[in-house]
């Protein structure tokens, strides 16, 4: 059996950028003896996480962990976080380094702007994924998360309500397209922002 490695295999731009950010902070903080934390493991790679731990980097696993920290640097990983987490880091006087993927940041801005303008927000993605949890935390209006065509079929909202649809950056593009089609048939006033990362789409096509 022949095994081929896809041209697009490997870590995406956002993850590489986040990892590089942590190593840069380690380098810059050597003389200061400053404790560096990442909000969640910076990458799903045990070797990299272990190497960072050996260099003194600690992992925060949620807001309860964050509450106990009184000094140091907190690095936000590529998945991003909700607005409340940013506020907590700043209010505790910690140094904030934001390594959120720029594509995820764009979703945060879109959700914030549209929700403030009165749109209900639909996030197509996995509700348990940290990226989706972070996106939800930027909405200031009704927010719905769905992951299947069945959920899209069942979705219902007051007819006069405006909708803005975004997606988890790693969601399957064909599935997203189909779910949007289902929602659009319900004749709501809808704005669709395709926020699936180009790298994700390329990998799905290559697969």
Predicted regions mapped to residue ranges:
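The feature marks the mature, well-folded catalytic cores of soluble enzymes
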Residues: 1-207
């Amino acid at each position: 059996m022949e095994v081929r490695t896809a041209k697009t295999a490997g870590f995406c731009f956002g993850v590489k950028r986040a990892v590089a950010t942590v190593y840069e902070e380690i380098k810059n903080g050597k003389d200061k003896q400053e404790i560096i934390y990442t909000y969640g493991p910076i990458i799903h790679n045990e070797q990299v996480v272990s190497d960072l731990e050996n260099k003194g980097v600690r992992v925060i696993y949620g807001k309860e962990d964050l509450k106990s920290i009184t000094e140091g640097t907190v690095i936000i990983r590529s998945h991003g976080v909700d607005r409340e987490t940013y506020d907590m880091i700043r209010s505790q006087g910690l140094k904030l380094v934001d390594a959120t993927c720029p594509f995820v940041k764009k979703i945060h801005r879109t959700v914030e702007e549209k929700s403030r303008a009165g749109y209900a927000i639909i996030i197509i993605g996995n509700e348990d994924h940290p990226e989706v949890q972070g996106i939800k935390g930027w909405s200031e209006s009704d927010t719905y998360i769905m992951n299947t065509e069945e959920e899209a079929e069942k979705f219902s909202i007051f007819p006069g309500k405006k909708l803005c649809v975004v997606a988890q950056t790693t969601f399957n593009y064909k599935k997203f397209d189909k779910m949007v089609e289902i929602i659009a048939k319900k004749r709501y006033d809808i704005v669709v922002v395709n926020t699936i990362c180009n790298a994700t789409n390329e990998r799905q096509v290559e697969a």
